Amino acid sequence: MSRAEHVAWCKQRALEYVDAGDLQNALASMGSDLNKHPETANHPGIKLGLMLMMTGNLSTRDEMRRHIEGYN
């Protein structure tokens, strides 16, 4: 699987959680799945997402969706 295909797969899975209203697991899924591919492991967006969530900046579905869709 290419890097781009893997990122698309990660986004799809994470957005399923967003659609269900489960924002914590959306972010956890994205981070966990990104770490499963050698070219996306330790992606800087993982730490950024955690910081944003801890400071209340990923508290709505729209905020989380924008964050997840921004990964590349």
Feature-to-residue mapping (PLM):
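N-terminal acidic leader/helix
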Residues: 1-31
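Alpha-helical linker/edge segments of TPR/alpha-solenoid repeat scaffolds
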Residues: 52-72
